[in-house]
Amino acid sequence: CELRFHPGCDQAYIEETASSISNALDTVKGDHPGSFSLFSNFESNSSFDEYQRAFTDIKMRIDCGDCYQVNLTQSFTAKGDGEPLAAYLRLRRATTAPFSAYLNWNSGALLSLSPERFLGLVDKAVLTQPIKGTRPRGSTKEADIQLAKDLLASEKDRAENLMIVDLLRNDLGRVCQIGSIEVKQLFSVESFSNVHHMVSDVSGTLKADRDALDLLTSCYPGGSITGAPKLSAMAII
């Protein structure tokens, strides 16, 4: 685990934050986080008919050329009781997600498990790894291999992935050095505990006068959660 701060952060703030995190870790170290349970089923924020109408409208907008890809999603809500950390640890045991986070405030907690690297920055080296294209894991080794092959060969998933790769190349181009942006890997399949994902790698070198916040501002929100072109997709959503 590595803690990084923006270069412009005040030293006193850095020390205070690091101390708070250290104290919090000491508090939970070795302690059982308690338990967490749901006492209601998950409910969507939209009915099936509403979702179907939205899907039909988006398809029409794509046919009209207003956009190429829209990431239509829905949220689910359930009631629960217990320690949020226990829920997070249970989720971690259920699925592998290399980019996970647990943040707890007085007003609530954020439990995040993501397989996708939105942005990585080491010195001036930038890396983004968009995911588009998913298949479930197979019940047998043979079925699992075939599902991964099907994903890799899918023209639809390749097209969606390529759209987001192009979008991110454009986003990085606003803050990276000219000529530094490269697609290091295109249409790779990565396997996790529950699914196969199609992943591509896009890299670049940040301009000398730009920093991490400039990079985030240029790329947020990630194209894989909006669609392409980004602004058109967001307006439709």
PLM segments and residue spans:
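Extended alpha-helical targeting/anchoring segments
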Residues: 1-237
